[in-house]
Regions:
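Conserved oxyanion/phosphate-binding beta-strand-loop segments in alpha/beta enzyme cores
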Residues: 2-20
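Glycine-rich N-terminal segment of FAD-binding domains in flavoprotein oxidoreductases
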Residues: 15-122, 135-140
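Short loop/turn motifs at secondary-structure junctions and domain boundaries
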Residues: 116, 144-149
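C-terminal substrate-binding/cap subdomain adjacent to the FAD-binding core in PCMH-type
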Residues: 152-320, 336
Length: 457
């Protein structure tokens, strides 16, 4: 079958195929048959329609920040979304961005108009389409939910190659199946996002604690306090068997107003062992990972294997489970530049159909961000195996996976994950991707359609 006429290029050179078989995790390598570098949205629609007729699987790749082959496909077509990066139509309450735009691009455009997305990921190099396909968590999620909860409208290419606009009011089934839908029912090509007024300054508190119990209590108090815009906990190895607990909290403000410095926040003293307070621009705060990224790129560690795990835990089980995991975890098992994230999320702020959360008003995002040695593949395998153990413990205590992980997942695992939403996802897959070609890297298995690829003409 002949390839459709394209404004861009469908390439199959060695360099492109090797590139498409890599991601940030460097643990899974699925080699496609071809890579599409689209000249526009019409190319995405045309190649998906072509793939459906020829039995080829399709995966969209944004910034390549997946860690376990989620945006790869073995013998299919990978769509490089990077050039579909236009950010436009910035208004007082919304902005439209193509799926390949990075969150840094979106922020630049909205800040010029005095606006910002309500939730930003820590690393702004991720793509809009990528995070909206999984959720998009950040330090303001205790107030605003995930990034998908700020989506007003999507443009989506379905598994039949149709370009469809969807929202809560139009084509609702596709809208619900696409937000946090792991690319199973459609490829996001653009999104209209709700934005809020942006502060110009940030008062940042970096508070260190001696133990996990105090650390959790302080974060819980801060989100109940209600005045802190950003709350995030980080845990680092300080010495063998000893962990350093760092709480980063931020108040956003506009001069001439100035927030009051306090380490005894709202009259509560949680026994900090070190306090650091600084005042920076909102832009610099949003880009706070940039110096660390530059250092890791210079050292080469940015290109090391990253075996990451993120789960969301019910509040009642968090202290015991995290304490148990930290008691067994060593600095070597975390890796040289690895760290742990632990911060609260109010589940009543999560409104997207396919976003999974524990049956708990307060939940905790817990992430083990492991970095493996580049010289020893056994390190990666050991970290992935350890991730699976933690994942299973989290699920057993009522937690859920945040679906970006370096964890092998079976179709049965995904049925457990989606729980009461599984049948809805399965029905949506049958409706919007009847050939079963979209985003096979997750191994979800919602569709039984056979794959018998035909030659590309």
């Amino acid at each position: 079958m002949l390839v459709p006429e394209l404004a861009g290029q469908l390439v199959c050179d060695e360099s492109s195929l090797r590139w498409a078989a890599e991601d940030f995790g460097h643990a899974v390598h699925r080699r496609p048959r071809a890579v599409l570098r689209p000249g526009g949205v019409a190319d995405v629609a045309a190649i998906v329609e072509f793939a459906g007729k020829t039995g080829l699987s399709v995966a969209a790749r944004g910034s390549g920040h997946s860690t376990y082959g989620q945006a790869q496909t073995n013998g299919g077509i990978v769509i490089d979304m990077a050039k579909l990066n236009l950010v436009s139509d910035v208004r007082a309450d919304r902005v439209t961005a193509q799926a390949g735009a990075r969150w840094s691009d979106v922020l630049d455009a909205t800040l010029a108009a005095g606006r910002t997305p309500a939730v930003l990921t820590d690393y702004l190099g991720t793509s809009v389409g990528g995070t909206l396909s999984v959720g998009g968590a950040g330090g303001t999620s205790h107030q605003h939910g995930f990034q998908v909860d700020s989506v007003e409208e999507l443009s989506v290419v379905t598994g039949t190659g149709r370009l469809v606009t969807c929202s809560l009011r139009q084509n609702r089934r596709l809208f619900d199946a696409t937000r946090a839908g792991l690319g199973q029912c459609g490829i996001i090509v653009s999104a209209t996002l709700r934005v809020i007024p942006a502060a110009s300054r940030v008062r940042r508190y970096r508070l260190q604690y001696r133990d996990l119990t105090t650390f959790l209590a302080a974060q819980h108090h801060l989100i109940n306090h209600g005045k802190f815009d950003f709350v995030q906990g980080q845990i680092f190895p300080a010495a063998p068997g000893v962990w350093q607990y760092l709480l980063e909290a931020a108040l956003y403000y506009m001069p001439p107003g100035t927030p009051v410095d306090a380490t005894r926040i709202d009259g509560q003293d949680y026994g900090t062992i070190a306090d650091e307070i600084d005042d920076i621009s909102y832009r610099d705060f949003a880009h706070r990972m940039a110096p660390g990224e530059a250092a890791l790129r210079d050292s080469g560690e940015w290109s090391y294997p990253h075996a990451w795990l993120t789960v969301v835990l019910p509040s009642a089980a968090t202290a015991s489970l995290v304490g148990e995991i930290l008691a067994r975890l060593t600095a070597a098992e975390l890796g040289q530049s690895g760290l742990v994230l632990l911060y609260p999320i109010r589940t009543d702020r999560l409104h997207t159909l396919l976003t999974r959360s524990p049956d708990s008003k307060l939940a905790w995002l817990f992430a083990l961000l492991r970095t493996a040695s580049v010289d020893n593949p056994a390190d990666v395998a050991a970290m992935i195996e350890a991730n699976r153990v933690v994942h299973d413990r989290a699920v057993a205590c009522g937690g859920v996976t945040y679906p970006i992980n370096s964890v092998p997942m079976s179709a049965a695992d995904w049925r457990i994950h989606f729980g009461p939403r599984w049948r809805q996802l399965q029905a949506a897959k049958e409706e919007f991707d009847p050939h079963g070609i979209l985003t096979p890297g997750y191994g979800i298995g919602t569709h039984s359609a056979p794959h018998c690829p035909k030659p590309i003409g």
